[in-house]
Amino acid sequence: MNVNKKQESIPVNTGSESISSNDNERFEQGKGVGSNLGSHFFEPVEYYYSDGKPMNQTEASQMKGTFSRDFSLNEMNNEFITDSFFCTTTPDPKTESPSFVKYNAHCDDHPEISGHVSSNDKDFAYFEDKSENQPLVTLPNENNQVIEPLSSQSCKSQLSTQNYSESDFGWNQLCDLDPIFKSLAFTDDTNLFPAFADSEAALIMLKKREMTRVKHRAGRPRKYSYVNKDLNFEEGLPRRRGRPTGWRKYPEKEEIYPTLSPRIKKPRKVFDAVVIPVTIKPSIYTEPSLPHHIDWNNGCSEEFDFEPSREDEDFPDLTSDSTGQDPLSSEPTIFDISPLPSDMEPTFSENSLITINKMAIEERKQSRRLEQPLAESQHQEDLLNPYGVDQDFDETCINESEQQATHIPNSSIKFNYDYTPPKSATSHKHKRVDLLASRKENVWTGLYGKVQTEMVSNRGEAVLNENNSKNRTNVTKPNSYKNSVLSIGNNHSNHSNIIKPNTYKNTILSNENNTPNYSNVCLSTSLINRSLPSLKSTMHPGVNKDLITRPFKNVNKMSVRKALIKPFHPPISKISRTRLTVSSPERLYCAKPISMATAPSETDSKLINRIRNLELEIGGLKEQLSVVELALDTDKNSKQIQVVERKIQNWRKSAQLAVEVLFPVFSLKFTTMLQEVPQSVLRTSANDLRTKPCSIGTYLEQLQIPFHLLQYNSETESWDLE
């Protein structure tokens, strides 16, 4: 610590005491007053009266006054902090006003910081910083009262204990100049600064925090868009009203909808997803390549249905040690298909088939009673059953099939492995109105004679055929003939799971060699129409022959015929005469071929020859016409070519004129540039370009314009005028 002289204490808070003799000696010597605060000291420089008149050292030495200072060094930031410094003196006997002394503040540790104490007001003395020329602290100085300098920690407590009037403290100046008072101005204790709210500093600070409120006119408030400036507002279109599209009313509510993601079955091992197995479980097999035989003579086909492979079933035989073919190899994969074990073969009997059909009939009857009211049901009964056939005829058919099932061999039964019994009664509900439209495809006849049964299922089919006449029996039930014969008119039954008897001649459904024959799902109407006349002749004498009708009733026959014929018109039956000149005349639409009755006569031959000659003349005239049209087109094209050539000449002249105007400017610039280019860059061509004057050809070459386009002759360096 640098100390100039012996450190002596300076009296503080003693306004009546004067400066000690040692201090006065130092003032007189001009060496300043030492301090016990370390290297901080003040050196008196000049002495003034309050009116600005300087005083000499003798007069200054006789002055009695006290001064106080508080300089501290911030150890944390190593910054020089000056809380306050002020000096008061006794009043001058001449002017009766307190005089003051101007000091310079020095700091050995921080030489860049310096200041001086001065006053231009008799009530205040303050410390100025030379760097900013802005007073830091302003404290009252009234009645020669010396106030101990206040630190930032003790300022609030000392201000609260002492009673100062508003005039004594310059609150506006204090808040604007001292950061200590600024921090105190925002404390909870508002009674300390009663006049702070009216100060200018308070207004400045309040403007930053003030909420600007817009007063609207009375009435309906304006609806502003979420966009500050509407894009369509400048175009004169009306502003958008309400919420923009895509904006929710309550955006803070995040609605999370649970999504059902499909379960991904991960492979248990890596090889489950990569290796192709060689052996497969016996129960899983693919469809073999069996021949698909079609019997064209009988109009029937053999179909083989096999169960598809079950994809949901795992492969327990597939392990990490399994060996398989490389997926990237081009060789075909070979699968070993083991035969189907005996315990897994489907078992199906006639009794189970009949039981299933009985259940389906009961479910159908029950659903029909619950589905339609009585009046509607009766109305549909009259429409669909005009002959009054008993609705329970299906049970009769089942009873007949029970008697015949024992005589049918199992070898003629064909099964589908996909067949499953009906799930519920709802799967068999069919509206009776829909059955009316499909009765053409379901014609069941129950005539006496040889009986053949057929069952058709939605999932599978079992065709029951009789191969020889020994296994066929005649039905002798007394009431069965009525229901079976009248079932031709009752075409409303559309149950595919029900066995229904069909009686036709053996030649219709089976061939003479007694080979197994598999019929289609539904009999074609043409087959039934051909068999109806023979059926009427071999019918029982007690049967009413008028009841046997075609697949659709006579009532609808004419309407159907009209509907089919209405959109078509009969073609013209005569042949166009122009076609007679051809050696092989073509038929026009459905016209009849030329016969002897319609052969052309001698009179017609003259007309034909004349027509032929006229056609030749017309052909020659057409050729001449085509030549004339070609000549006209050529003339037109020549005129168009002339127009295009004229436009090209006009453009060429304008381009030549533009080159002549721009060439002098280019040549001057180009020549100037060539003078600056060194010979090493252009080598041999540099001298030639310097010596040879720039021409229009060089200008066109720089622009990459061909000479022939503007008809420029490089030899004569001129335009070729045509």
From Swiss-Prot:
Residues 302-316 have a biased composition (Acidic residues). Coiled coil: none annotated. Residues 9-22, 319-332 have a biased composition (Polar residues). The keyword Metal-binding does not apply. GO terms for molecular function: sequence-specific double-stranded DNA binding. One of its GO terms (biological process) is DNA recombination. Keywords: Cell cycle. One of its GO terms (cellular component) is nucleolus. Residues 1-35, 301-342 are annotated as: Disordered. Interacts with swi5 and rhp51. Required for normal mating-type switching. This is Mating-type switching protein swi2. It comes from Schizosaccharomyces pombe (strain 972 / ATCC 24843) (Fission yeast). The lineage of its organism: Eukaryota, Fungi, Dikarya, Ascomycota, Taphrinomycotina.
